[in-house]
Structures are given as C-alpha cells and as structure tokens.
Amino acid sequence: VYGVALGVSVSYIFIFVLLGSLLDRCGAGNYMMQVSFALLGHLRGGPAKVAVVSSAVNGIVSASSVANVVTGGIFTIPLMKKAGYGGVRAGAIETASSVNGQIMPPVMGAAAFLMIEYVGIPYTDIIKHALLPASISYVALFYIVHLEALKLGIMPMMSAGAPKTPLQKLAGWGMGIAGTLVVMGLVYWIGIGVRAVAGGAATPILLVLLLVLSVWLLRISARHPDLPTDINVTNPVRPESWPTVRSGLYYLIPIGILVWCLAVDQLSAGLSAFWAVMAMLFQMVTQ
C-alpha cells in the first residue's frame, strides 16, 4: 500500500518520534540539560560545552535537530552570549551540535531506517557503525568550542557548592565512571544469567526485576528536589553534580530497554522502540 519512504515512516519513524516526544514531555530533555550543566558548567567556555554535550545526549533520546534546538538552544544560546561567545558563534555552535544529534545512536534520523529497507542492513549494524563517527564529531566540536573559549578569554561560571581541589574532582569523576561501568556490567550479566538459568520463564522474571529497579530509582529520585524547568540565564549558577544526576536516573530505563532489545535480544527496531514506549508510559503513570 505504502511506498518505501512512507512505509518506513509508518513502521519505524513514528514509534521512535513517539518515544522521543514522551521522554521530552516527561522531563528527560530538561534532565539531560541540567546534568550537562552541572557536570560541565565549571569548565572554561562551559555554556558552549554544555550545548555540545546536551545536544549529544538529547540526540540519544530524540534524534531530531529541531527538537534539539528548541529544548536546549533557548537556554544555551543566551548563556553562550552572556559568557562572551557572541550571537553568531553561539548560534553556529548550537546548530552544529543539534544537527549531529541525528547520527547519534540508538535513536537516529530517518536515513537510518531508509537504509534498513533499501540496503537490508540490520539496525544493530547501523548503530555499531554510526557510534564511532558520531562520537568523533562531538569530540571535535567539544575541542573547537574549547579553542574558541581560549581565544576569547572566557572564564568558568560560578558553582553552587564550595570549590573542589583537582584531586577531589578527579576522584569524583573516577568514582562516577567506575560506578557507571559496574552497574552496566551487573545489569548485563544479571540479564544473561537469568536467561541462561530460567529459560522460558526468563521474561517474566526480568520484568519483575525491571519493575523493582524502576521503583528503586524512583525512590532515589524522590529524595531529591525537582529540577528547575529552565536555567537562570541572567544569573547562571552551576548546581551540584551528584544530586542533579540522581534526581532523574529513572529516565535512563526506557533508553536502556531500547538498547537491550536492539543489541542483546536482537529484536527489530520497531519492536524495540515499542517496548521502550511501554516503559516510558509506565513511568509517566507512576511519576
């Protein structure tokens, strides 16, 4: 009934756009922005680096250039202008960062789904081959905005908490990265172990474990105050990193489900996005 392009839109693009819209409406876009601001706002040229990193993580969620600019640009562009980048540079940085969000796995632009239909490449292979170029493009943008900050003499912004020594910063980053890797490894091996031991009963067991994980992360987030809906452009103050990260960890569950279904269970792109949408709807009901 449909042509190839329209069939791809109905079969794949719609469900991924729905997932990105639900995540954004639920607050995941603002969470990504606040976390980027908390982690990078203290660096030289922090607003521009926040724009680059927040566009990358928003690209993971939505893969939409327009949505990226709308959700992040209204805050990062004024912040960059206030820091001293100027209107032209600020707009160029936000545009380049947002456009690259379309090639950031696992949710990608329409061209990735057209490749599935025209070439017959599995979506997991597209993700694997797109990850390195997307990462390199954002590393290059991060480096470019740092050079611009050095040329313009832009200084770091103020922090909400007491200043930390370089050793404290290194220890904090080390613990954060190590903890993230440990948690990812535990989740992977627990899932593989349950499938190996339980066999056909693995799916309901994994659903129960996922429900317990969701409730636990919601409980952690409930102990912290809600994130502000925007950044104070007039007088920006960087929030504390760890409380900001913990306040929205449950947003990572739908993204984790999407990646698991695509990479581990080898499900189709549409079915993987469907299960991620179901998880997102559950979170919206229980929030």
Mark where each language-model region is.
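Core transmembrane alpha-helical segments of multi-pass membrane transporters/permeases
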Residues: 1-30, 264, 269-276
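Hydrophobic transmembrane alpha-helices that form the pore/transport pathway of multi-pass ion
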Residues: 33-101, 107-114, 120
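Helix-coil boundary and interhelical linker segments in multi-pass alpha-helical membrane proteins
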Residues: 116-132
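Long, contiguous bundles of hydrophobic transmembrane helices that form the permeation core
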Residues: 128-287
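Transmembrane alpha-helical segments of multi-pass membrane transport proteins and ion-pumping complexes
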Residues: 13, 17, 21-26, 30, ...
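Helix-boundary and loop/linker segments of multi-pass membrane transporters
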Residues: 2-7, 44, 244-248
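Flexible loop linkers connecting adjacent transmembrane helices
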Residues: 30-40, 75-76, 122, 152-161, ...
